[in-house]
């Protein structure tokens, strides 16, 4: 999977999430303002709870829109064996057992997994602790991470 395909996959997933959260926010807003939701007494908080839910859904939709804007504006730099890890890099890490992980350094949507025939690609952001460790490293550099609750040493195998 090329980096352009990765970004296209992220954008498609974010667009689907945006549609879902926008619809959920609209539904929660209608529930909060519906006449049957008006409180019967001072202990009836149904409308208040629905309004909190609507606001949360709207906030999440706004965050997703910001992520979409960031990915649509993302420049995908070319890397070589001397290039340090930075935003837009597809990094392959190897651990001491020989297993490899591929990470895409993106501006948002950290934690998203994209399926590929060569194995999952996980999006991480420069703001994450692991992303902060990766930034500036070169092929052959080592870093420490946590996996399944134990410390694991990784080596940067490639930066594309």
Positions of PLM-derived features:
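Charged, alpha-helix-enriched surfaces in structured cytosolic catalytic cores
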Residues: 5, 9, 16, 100, ...
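Sparse recognition of residues in long alpha-helices and their boundaries
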Residues: 37, 73, 155-157
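Short, charged beta-turn/beta-strand-edge "cap" motif at the junction between a beta-strand
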Residues: 97-98, 146-154, 160
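Non-DNA-binding regulatory cores of transcription-related proteins
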Residues: 81-146
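Helix-rich terminal scaffold detector
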Residues: 1-67
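Long amphipathic N-terminal alpha/beta scaffold segment
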Residues: 55, 59-99
């Amino acid at each position: 999977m090329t980096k352009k395909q990765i970004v296209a996959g992220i954008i498609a997933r974010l667009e689907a999430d945006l549609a879902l959260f926008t619809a959920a926010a609209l539904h929660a807003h209608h529930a909060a303002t519906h006449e049957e939701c008006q409180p019967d007494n001072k202990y009836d908080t149904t409308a208040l709870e629905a309004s909190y839910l609507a606001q949360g859904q709207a906030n999440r939709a706004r965050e997703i829109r910001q992520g979409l804007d960031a990915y649509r504006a993302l420049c995908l730099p070319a890397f070589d064996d001397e290039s340090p890890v930075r935003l837009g890099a597809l990094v392959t890490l190897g651990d001491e057992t020989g297993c490899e992980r591929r990470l895409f350094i993106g501006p948002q949507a950290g934690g998203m997994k994209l399926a590929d025939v060569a194995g999952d690609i996980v999006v991480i952001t420069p703001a994450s602790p692991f992303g902060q460790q990766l930034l500036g490293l070169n092929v052959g550099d080592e870093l420490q991470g946590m996996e399944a609750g134990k410390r694991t040493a990784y080596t940067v195998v490639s930066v594309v």
